[in-house]
């Protein structure tokens, strides 16, 4: 219990000591992975560019972060998005699918990123293959010390300038703990940052978190929205967006 409390306090200390960055997180300390290793991973694209990550929940539902539905404070519409599935490369191969409807949490707060979660309904159902698969929602939070995987196309370095990969990245991170708002995971050298927002945090082939915010220079833990904490909202939102 002491170790669990210490890890959580460490995460909170990291994120309170520095400003938490809002959008677009990146993979730090990761490596190239193939889409078959994370077949639920998708790239949200706006104006032909990768903007955020997301996860396939079903043949027509994507889970992502609420702040991914905004561009410079402007609320985007479903028609503004294309979703690339089934490719390790954000800019080629796989399939591009249009979005029919979007819904973010009604209590989403853009200042502190609480309730930073959203769902999207695709305009046509996906064909599942070894490169395109759904991922189930976790029913409980993982214990501190659990190893999880985070993936995405976010920046891989920040100095001397931001460097973004074309190829999907993945990294194993340590679960630090949860509080009433967020799940924390990662550390200096192994974390998320600019471009990975909305992407998956996975334990035992289950979606446990959605990338939300990070330490200002992406050199500390990442805060995720807990999927188990938002499970009821997700299931209700998915049902409503299918109507």
Segments predicted by a language model, with ranges:
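Extracellular/luminal ectodomains of metazoan preproproteins built from arrays
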Residues: 4-36, 129-130, 141-148, 235-243
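Extracellular/periplasmic catalytic domains that process cell-envelope and extracellular macromolecules
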Residues: 33-37, 56, 75-77, 91, ...
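Conserved, non-catalytic sequence blocks in retroelement Pol enzymes and Pol-derived host proteins
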Residues: 29-35, 108-112, 161-163, 191-195, ...
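Conserved, well-structured core segments
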Residues: 40-43, 52-63, 117-121, 149-152, ...
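Conserved H-D interstitial segment of serine endopeptidase catalytic domains
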Residues: 20-26, 44, 62-107, 166-172, ...
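Catalytic histidine site
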Residues: 34-76, 216
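Chymotrypsin/trypsin-fold serine protease catalytic domain
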Residues: 87-88, 100, 117, 122-123, ...
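C-terminal subregion of chymotrypsin/trypsin-like serine protease catalytic domains
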Residues: 2-14, 57-70, 81, 172, ...
């Amino acid at each position: 219990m002491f170790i669990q409390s210490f890890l959580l306090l460490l995460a909170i200390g990291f994120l309170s000591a520095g400003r938490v960055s809002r959008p677009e997180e990146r993979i730090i300390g990761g490596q190239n992975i193939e889409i078959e290793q994370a077949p639920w991973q998708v790239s949200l694209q706006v104006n032909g560019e990768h903007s955020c990550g997301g996860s396939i929940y079903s043949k027509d539902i994507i889970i992502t972060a609420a702040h991914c539905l905004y561009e410079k404070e402007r609320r985007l519409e479903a028609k503004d998005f294309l979703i690339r599935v089934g490719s390790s490369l954000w800019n080629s191969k796989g399939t591009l699918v249009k979005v029919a409807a979007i819904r973010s949490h009604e209590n989403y707060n853009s200042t502190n990123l609480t309730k930073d979660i959203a769902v999207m309904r695709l305009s046509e159902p996906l064909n599942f293959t070894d490169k395109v698969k759904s991922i189930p929602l976790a029913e409980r939070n993982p214990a501190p010390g659990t190893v999880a995987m985070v993936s995405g196309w976010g920046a891989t370095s920040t100095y001397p300038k931001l460097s973004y990969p074309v190829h999907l990245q993945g990294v194993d991170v340590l679960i630090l703990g949860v509080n009433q708002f967020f799940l924390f995971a990662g550390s200096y050298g192994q974390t998320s940052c600019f471009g990975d927002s909305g992407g998956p945090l996975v334990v035992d082939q289950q979606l446990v978190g959605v990338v939300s915010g990070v330490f200002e220079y992406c050199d500390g833990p990442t805060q995720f929205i807990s999927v188990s904490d938002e499970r009821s909202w997700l299931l209700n939102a998915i049902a409503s967006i299918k109507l």
